[in-house]
Amino acid sequence: MPYAQIEDGVRLYYELTGPDHGPVILQLGGGLFGRHNFGLVNDGFRERFRLLSFDARGYGASDHPRGAYSIEGWAADAAGLLDAVGLDRVLVHGTSMGGMIAIAFTAAYPERTIAACADVAFAKPDVYRRTVFRGWRRMVETMAWDDFSDHVTTQAVGARFMESPEGENIFQLVRDIVALNDPYTVRHACLAMENMDLSSSVPRISRPLLMTNGTHDILCPPDLAPSGLGARKMAELNEVIELVEFPDIGHADLVECPADATRIVGEFFERALEAALASPPLTSADWSPPSR
């Protein structure tokens, strides 16, 4: 199993798949699904891109140190992973909590970012969303794991999709993946999202950032109440940020419309690569890890 040890000694499990010389997409998974969030879009992306998928600190086969977790801390871990595997600049694709990490990463590490997509994410939760995450945190502490998984599924996946042939097994799928998690990490992930405030980072973002949001998402909608900072407002504040909405779904575009998600994000990355290659010093060597 491939592991990378980052600066503070934590070992991260990672997989690097796809065409050897393809542009690399660093994938940042969500707080409950982790790297499994991308399971239905990986094959589509691998037709053109190389994928760097990993278990974040506290998840899966990576180390699970006890202590505080934060969105900015997970972004720093991602930069450490790039150092460890010998990658200079990458495309970044994060979803849900991973989208929040993508925002933090793009702001903090512009020299490592060609372009980024923050899927179903925002920069700061409003009162409603903070209450949702606090509720999740309490559920993790008190509810049966399967009951918590079912509750989250009803918030993340649309009612019509649940009753469609594609969504027939969605509840069991979510149960199986959520069961892989360490409850300690999930609790701290909820706390990290509850307390997150990337407002000051948004104006500093200098690399192209695509926000993809479902119009009917109750967890991370494009528009938040005044105390929050959602995708639409982010795009108004910074000209390098753009928003694409999925008009018929909620939080789970990578599950409910994976082909559309792959196409929209892939085309955005292609345009960003074209622009970056036209503006040296970026070359294809920047995203090619050394032979091992």
Task: Spell out what each predicted region is.
Residues 37-39, 62-68, 128-130, 222-223:
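Conserved catalytic-core motifs of eukaryotic protein kinase domains, centered on the activation segment
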Residues 43, 52-93, 263:
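Active-site loop/oxyanion-hole signature of alpha/beta-hydrolase fold enzymes
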Residues 238-292:
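Catalytic active-site module of serine/aspartate enzymes centered on a nucleophile-bearing elbow/loop
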